[in-house]
């Protein structure tokens, strides 16, 4: 027979007795009790006590309280999470509303600024127009007709006092305007006379129709501007005259220095070539500029001419040597007169002095 070699292996460990009908030390007394009473695994009977051992599992009270607390906390946590999600959704919705409101606020602030600027410009234009009309009313005085007779009403009693008070003020203003017109006319006449005497080519300041220009009473700024313009014109004229004088003085000094340099070069040539010195000296004209008149004049001075004429009258028969001596004396005298220091008027002592003429060696 085929018998399992290990039948003990399949025996129930929960049975109360083993194969030898001995109570097992690992058996379940509750299970065995149920089995003995005809219950089994699906038995739904109430708690049964086998001796002093209770059939239900023993659970401590602390564990039960802890489990209840944990369940309550979990439930509360879920509720709080739901509330948090709803609040977050509300925050997102409010953020979108804030963004739209911010855009509208920026738009309306820009519109407000634009409207304020337009209003300010309009008010400024109105103020300017009012000021212009007030000025016209101030300077164009139209007499008003008053048909109300004095003493008929309290209003008529108040009007003469106003007129009496306004008359002296108007008289003072008119006097001041007349004085101002006279002063401006005097200043303009004086300036025009000064400008005409200083330079005739420049146009004098406009003095025609001073009453029309100053009919409204010129301000201090207008007077100062006019005076500054006239002073500037005078300064420009003075500067141009000074510049011309300086250029003229420089040209004269340059001419003198060039003439002196030319004489020095002539002296050097005379020293180098003594044979041709007399011929070159006779051919060269060293007379200073502007010494000749419009008509042709002789190349010798009056003293030499008188000397020559007296000598010719006394001695008619001169030889060639005497003629050469006279000509040498004439040219030597002309050269010494030209080498004298020129007399130039020096108005400014700080100008460059004239160079000294060098004596020929």
From Swiss-Prot:
GO terms for molecular function: structural constituent of cytoskeleton. One of its GO terms (cellular component) is cytoplasm. Residues 193-208, 311-328 have a biased composition (Low complexity). Forms a polymeric layer at the periphery of the spindle pole body (SPB) central plaque which has an essential function during SPB duplication and may facilitate attachment of the SPB to the nuclear membrane. This is Spindle pole body component SPC42. Residues 334-343 have a biased composition (Basic and acidic residues). GO terms for biological process: spindle pole body duplication. Belongs to the SPC42 family. Residues 1-24, 189-219, 308-361 are annotated as: Disordered. It is found in: Nucleus; Cytoplasm, Cytoskeleton, Microtubule organizing center, Spindle pole body. Residues 61-125, 169-270 form a coiled coil. It comes from Vanderwaltozyma polyspora (strain ATCC 22028 / DSM 70294 / BCRC 21397 / CBS 2163 / NBRC 10782 / NRRL Y-8283 / UCD 57-17).
């Amino acid at each position: 027979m085929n018998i399992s070699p290990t039948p003990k292996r399949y025996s129930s460990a929960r049975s109360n007795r083993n194969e030898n009908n001995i109570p097992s030390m690992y058996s379940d007394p509750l299970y065995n009790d149920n089995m003995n009473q005809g219950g089994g695994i699906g038995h739904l009977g109430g708690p049964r006590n086998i001796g002093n051992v209770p059939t239900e599992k023993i659970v401590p009270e602390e564990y039960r309280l802890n489990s209840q607390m944990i369940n309550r906390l979990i439930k509360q946590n879920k509720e709080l999470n739901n509330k948090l999600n709803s609040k977050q959704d509300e925050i997102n919705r409010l953020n979108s509303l804030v963004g739209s409101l911010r855009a509208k606020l920026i738009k309306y602030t820009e519109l407000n600024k634009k409207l304020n600027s337009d209003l300010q410009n309009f008010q400024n234009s109105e103020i300017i127009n009012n000021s212009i009309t007030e000025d016209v009313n101030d300077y164009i005085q139209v007499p008003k007709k008053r048909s109300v007779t004095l003493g008929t009403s309290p209003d008529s009693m108040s009007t003469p006092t106003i007129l009496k008070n306004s008359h002296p003020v108007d008289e003072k203003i008119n006097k001041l305007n007349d004085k101002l017109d006279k002063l401006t006319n005097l200043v303009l006449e004086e300036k025009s006379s000064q400008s005409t005497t200083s330079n005739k080519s420049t146009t004098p300041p406009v003095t025609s129709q001073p009453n029309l220009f100053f009919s409204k009473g010129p301000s201090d700024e207008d007077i100062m501007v006019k005076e500054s313009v006239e002073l500037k014109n005078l300064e420009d004229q003075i500067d141009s005259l000074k510049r011309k004088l300086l250029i003229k003085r420089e040209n004269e000094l340059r001419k003198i220095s060039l003439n002196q340099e030319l004489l020095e070069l002539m002296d050097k040539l005379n020293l180098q070539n003594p044979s041709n010195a007399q011929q070159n000296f006779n051919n060269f004209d060293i007379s200073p500029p502007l010494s000749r008149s419009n008509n042709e004049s002789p190349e010798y001075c009056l003293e030499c001419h008188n000397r020559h004429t007296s000598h010719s009258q006394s001695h008619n028969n001169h030889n060639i040597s005497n003629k050469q001596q006279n000509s040498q004396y004439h040219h030597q005298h002309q050269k010494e007169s030209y080498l004298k220091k020129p007399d130039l008027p020096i108005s400014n002592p700080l100008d460059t002095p004239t160079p000294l003429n060098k004596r020929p060696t």
